[in-house]
């Protein structure tokens, strides 16, 4: 394992709190001004990286000291990530930029087990973190020769439209004859990890809205993808950005006021064009179009591995990439086959990702209903999940491994997160090695840190699909993948 570089940022609160200001996130009614002072504890003679693998921030929120830990999201990009745009004569231009030293991070607040964070450190600190159940945003103030940042609650951002926005997918309300299990009862870490290799496309209206600035558009896409990884981590789904495409000279599929027509045309373009030149699992269209009937997005249901229907469309909100990410997470949920939440569904927040009415305050949580449906039904459907098993191998991840980030990487036996959060007795959170006497730490064929006996059914058949059985040599349940 590498030595994790610890960087301390002291954020000193400015002598006043602002009452109102226009920021990139919108018009903010109440905010704190802080000045990040970076103090780096590097060994003498060591070379500082441009973007460290791990950082620590110490600052105050409402006078309360907090510690924010950040780790680079090393699973943000797939190994063969590409970017495509078009010349004035319509010629496709595709490049394969180096993305190893990127500036997008996940994190958490110390001593707050419920906290999450998604931060860009490209030009100052920009993103959001959750503290004591409240969502806070941080972003740099655009002042000359100043390191000032604003910190504010999401609820203090003036909303663009107080009217409820709707998801365009209908007839997908959650129903089940099975009792709803609490999240803690699902034992979700034992599910096999899957990977959605995702392409994001920015349409021509979005291109003109950003004044043709392809770099800014790409940065927004990276922020959205970074947020998606946070949302899908509880399901053990990695969302890997495998490509971006910007329709710089005009739309390549029909984009109209009708979300249904736009979705259908986009799916046809994917099957006809994109799939023939770029291997991927799902593609999402970011559009500047404001659809009829206050629809914020549209996606096909139970369509993840379908050549035409594994698509979604989402309206772009220029100032709020975290809001766009929330709505894209909702659409991806439908692609996987997850239904809208019913009245009995809960996630411990005001709204959940699969709520039919899109809240102005985004949620980064799936409800107990969504997690139950995923663990009890969706993972057994080969037609909506088979394409998600070809996750890039551990050796394909180009950045160094970090113990404690929940992802199994080269040199690790297990990774149950930071020591303060790890609840797996089979895994030593400080070394990411198995504890003495343990054979495994997770998997459908792992019980009490030991391999389950050979021949034990680990995945019960659904319909004509055969049972899968443990081998007695691994904690993983082999996917046989055939009908009997």
From Swiss-Prot:
The keyword Disulfide bond applies. It comes from the Eukaryota. One of its GO terms (biological process) is proteolysis. Disulfide bonds join 305-387, 345-369, 347-352, 403-422, 414-432, 416-427, 426-449, 440-446, 445-470, 458-477. Pfam families: Disintegrin (PF00200), Pep_M12B_propep (PF01562), Reprolysin (PF01421). Expressed by the venom gland. The keyword Cell inner membrane does not apply. Residues 21-191 form a propeptide. GO terms for molecular function: metalloendopeptidase activity; toxin activity. Residues 194-392 form the Peptidase M12B domain. Residues 1-20 form the signal peptide. Gene3D superfamilies: Collagenase (Catalytic Domain), Disintegrin domain. Keywords: Cell adhesion impairing toxin, Disulfide bond, Glycoprotein, Hemostasis impairing toxin, Platelet aggregation inhibiting toxin, Secreted, Signal, Toxin. One of its GO terms (cellular component) is plasma membrane. A motif (Cell attachment site) lies at residues 462-464. Residues 400-484 form the Disintegrin domain. It is found in: Secreted. Glycans are attached at residues 80, 251, 301. The disintegrin belongs to the dimeric disintegrin subfamily. The function of this complete protein has not been studied, but it may be similar to the function of the disintegrin domain. A recombinant protein of this domain (409-484) inhibits collagen-induced human platelet aggregation, without having effect on ADP-induced aggregation. It may act either by blocking the binding of fibrinogen to the platelet receptor GPIIb/GPIIIa (ITGA2B/ITGB3) or by blocking the binding of collagen to the integrin alpha-2/beta-1 complex (ITGA2/ITGB1). PANTHER family: ADAM A DISINTEGRIN AND METALLOPROTEASE DOMAIN, DISINTEGRIN AND METALLOPROTEINASE DOMAIN-CONTAINING PROTEIN 28. Homodimer; disulfide-linked (disintegrin). Belongs to the venom metalloproteinase (M12B) family. P-II subfamily. P-IIb sub-subfamily. This is Zinc metalloproteinase homolog-disintegrin albolatin. It comes from Trimeresurus albolabris. The lineage of its organism: Eukaryota, Metazoa, Chordata, Craniata, Vertebrata.
């Amino acid at each position: 394992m590498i030595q994790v570089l610890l960087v301390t940022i002291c954020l000193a609160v400015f002598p006043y709190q602002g009452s109102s200001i226009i920021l990139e996130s919108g018009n903010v009614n109440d905010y704190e001004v802080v000045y990040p002072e970076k103090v780096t504890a590097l060994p003498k003679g060591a070379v500082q990286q441009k973007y460290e693998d791990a950082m620590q921030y110490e600052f105050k929120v409402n006078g309360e000291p907090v510690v924010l830990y950040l780790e680079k999201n090393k699973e943000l990009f797939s190994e063969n990530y590409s970017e495509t745009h078009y010349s004035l004569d319509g010629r496709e231009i595709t490049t394969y930029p180096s993305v190893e030293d990127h500036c997008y991070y996940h994190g958490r607040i110390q001593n707050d087990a419920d906290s999450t964070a998604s931060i860009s450190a490209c030009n100052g600190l920009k993103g959001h973190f959750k503290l004591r159940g409240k969502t806070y945003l941080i972003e740099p103030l655009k002042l000359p020769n100043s390191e000032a940042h604003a910190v504010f609650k999401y609820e203090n951002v003036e909303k663009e439209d107080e009217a409820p926005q709707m998801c365009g997918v209908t007839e997908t309300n959650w129903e089940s004859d099975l009792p709803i299990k609490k999240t803690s009862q699902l034992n979700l870490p034992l599910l096999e990890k899957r990977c959605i290799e995702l392409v994001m496309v920015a349409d021509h209206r979005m291109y003109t809205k950003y004044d043709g600035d392809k770099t800014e558009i790409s940065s927004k896409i990276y922020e959205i993808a970074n947020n998606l990884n946070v949302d899908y981590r509880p399901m053990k789904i990695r969302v890997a950005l495998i490509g971006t495409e910007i329709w710089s000279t005009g739309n390549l599929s029909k984009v109209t006021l009708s979300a249904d027509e736009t979705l259908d045309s986009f799916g046809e373009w994917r099957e006809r064009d994109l799939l023939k030149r770029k291997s991927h699992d799902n593609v999402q269209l970011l559009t500047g179009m404001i659809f009829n009937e206050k629809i914020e997005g549209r996606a096909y249901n139970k369509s993840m591995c379908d050549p035409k229907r594994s698509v979604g469309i989402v309206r772009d909100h220029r100032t709020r990439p975290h809001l766009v990410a929330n709505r894209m997470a909702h659409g991806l949920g439908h692609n996987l086959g997850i239904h809208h939440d019913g009245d009995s569904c809960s996630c411990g927040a005001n709204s959940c990702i699969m709520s039919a009415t899109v809240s102005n305050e985004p949620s980064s949580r799936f409800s107990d209903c969504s997690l139950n449906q995923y663990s009890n039904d969706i993972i057994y459907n080969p037609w909506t999940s088979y394409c998600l098993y070809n996750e890039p191998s551990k050796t394909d991840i180009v950045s160094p491994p970090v113990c404690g980030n929940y992802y199994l990487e080269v040199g690790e036996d297990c990774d149950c997160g930071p020591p303060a959060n790890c609840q797996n007795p089979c895994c030593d959170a400080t070394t990411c090695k198995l504890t003495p006497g343990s054979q495994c730490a997770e998997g459908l064929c792992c019980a009490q840190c030991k391999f389950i006996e050979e021949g034990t059914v680990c995945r019960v058949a659904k319909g004509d699909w055969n049972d899968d059985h443990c081998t007695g040599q691994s904690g993983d349940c082999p996917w046989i993948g055939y009908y009997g």
